[in-house]
């Protein structure tokens, strides 16, 4: 999450938070959200993992020449990622791996991104090479006229999987309103 936050904070600095800057950011995220933005998030995550590893070295993570086996180190820190930026004019949703990002109203629970579904426990992870290639993202304009209550929910796949049916999961999401 910190990697997503740090990258998004930098994008907001570059583009600016005024109307023109956010308009340009929407355009960029629509075109590059699941590629360039995803690459930046993965690079930030790897830099943080390396920094943590240098502070807290783990035995067995070097080869016979003493070179660090980064894929093995990354797998120690492997995780999926859900992130969201909410502005007055748009919502940007970003995901690598499993989980759910949805908009919830009293009438519906609508996914904002459609990640690849897996059977069993297999999933995409930041620890895998080229994890950014598996990122999914969406930009949705916000409708400001609606007076109806709504919320966004970001959850691990364990939340949805803990219900006996999708209907039960959706009912619980609506109950949070």
Each model region followed by its residue ranges:
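PP2C/PPM-type serine/threonine phosphatase catalytic domain
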Residues: 1-177
């Amino acid at each position: 999450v910190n990697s997503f936050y740090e990258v998004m904070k930098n994008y907001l600095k570059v583009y600016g938070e005024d109307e023109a800057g956010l308009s340009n950011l929407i355009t960029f995220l629509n075109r590059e959200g699941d590629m360039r933005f995803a690459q930046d998030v993965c690079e930030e995550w790897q830099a943080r993992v390396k920094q943590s590893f240098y502070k807290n070295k783990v035995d067995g993570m070097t080869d016979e020449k003493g070179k660090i086996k980064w894929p093995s180190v990354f797998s120690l820190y492997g995780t999926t990622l859900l992130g969201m930026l909410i502005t007055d004019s748009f919502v940007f949703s970003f995901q690598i791996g499993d989980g759910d990002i949805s908009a919830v109203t009293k009438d519906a629970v609508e996914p904002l991104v459609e990640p690849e579904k897996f059977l069993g426990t297999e999933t995409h992870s930041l620890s895998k090479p080229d994890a950014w290639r598996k990122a999914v993202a969406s930009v949705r304009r916000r409708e400001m006229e609606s007076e109806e209550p709504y919320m966004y929910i970001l959850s691990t796949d364990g939340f949805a999987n803990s219900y006996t049916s999708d209907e039960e999961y959706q009912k619980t999401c609506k109950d949070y309103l």
